[in-house]
């Protein structure tokens, strides 16, 4: 690619959209710090001991203002950091500029092409001749995937001399990944194997990335230990639920200015993300219908006063469609053709394959009208009616708005810091094998406790007699590992 890495006056590499936005980014970072008590407590507690001294951390996670506070927490604890975004639309350019100028190497801008996206991922992993990172903070698992695919290709090349063939897959992103790996083999045929040897572990932020990790663990191909941050209670029950409850309507209204009240809204999936989305739409006055495969989740939706139907039942009736499943092929182009004129179609799951964007883009005679960035009207030739697709089927809350608010992200990112400290602290102990782990309950409770004071909460204290009666320590943890909250 023709992209060139730039360098700050202090010698730090970067590639962002506009460094003149750095002062603006710094002002918003300072505001966010006040709303992120968990991360600021980590700086206070761990800063003096510098637990990351000598550690290289590569991050692939939405380059937002909130992520900037996470990055500067990692650097405040002694780490060197290189960062890219995990979505082509999610970067906040002023945040990227501030971090690139002040704290860490950043390769991210809003509106990357897929080629640029993977170039940025490669740059975030490029620590020069000394090898790759020690630790990875991942969101969706793309950097983890790149390393695993790279190692696999290098091993095949070493045995057979065969280079990866990008034409062997129909997936456009995988074609780019294989091209990057193929070109890299010509200059350093052991790059990813050397990287694998150095990596201590990864902490994964989201449901989709965790699913990939468990698949690799099951197949015996996971190359290094992983901590599943997503399934910490203080992540999934807060970020996924309350974060989406906040950011879904924000994205809808910024993109379309539509009035939610009175509309028929379909939420595909009723997991934690779906629950947050359905709650937001219901509170906004929409009539909410849920589609589900799981009878337990379906029953939960019914108990909240929601209808549970199939997509086919409501496809021509609904005004708003939101996919939240983490699966693929949820809304196909054949479904979109049946929707009412100007129905809004959007996704808040991690990848863009929940909505059949390829089928829509290649539909004969379809016309795309860009209303504004990340808001497109697609008109079908047969009916002359159209649908409005947000963020090209990618994360609409980050593509059309600014994602989750700082406070709830403080919960998620405090888990990330604790997971990274745990992996680095135990790097030579053998405690973590090439498996997927979750953080223990007492750390989950600690993350929650760090956020109570800011909201004016006061915890009731157990007496020793009461604690003995329910068989828990006075200081916690208070729930068994299987408790579902």
UniProtKB/Swiss-Prot annotation:
Q: What gene codes for this chain?
A: SAHH
Question: What processes in GO biological process is this protein linked to?
Answer: one-carbon metabolic process; S-adenosylmethionine cycle
Which source organism?
Medicago sativa
Question: In the Enzyme Commission scheme, what number(s) does this protein have?
Answer: 3.13.2.1
Keyword NAD among record annotations: yes
Cellular component (GO) terms are: cytosol
Q: Name one GO molecular function term.
A: adenosylhomocysteinase activity
Residue spans crossing the bilayer:
none
Name of the protein this chain belongs to:
Adenosylhomocysteinase
| Keywords annotated in UniProt | Hydrolase, NAD, One-carbon metabolism
Pfam families from the xrefs? Answer: AdoHcyase, AdoHcyase_NAD
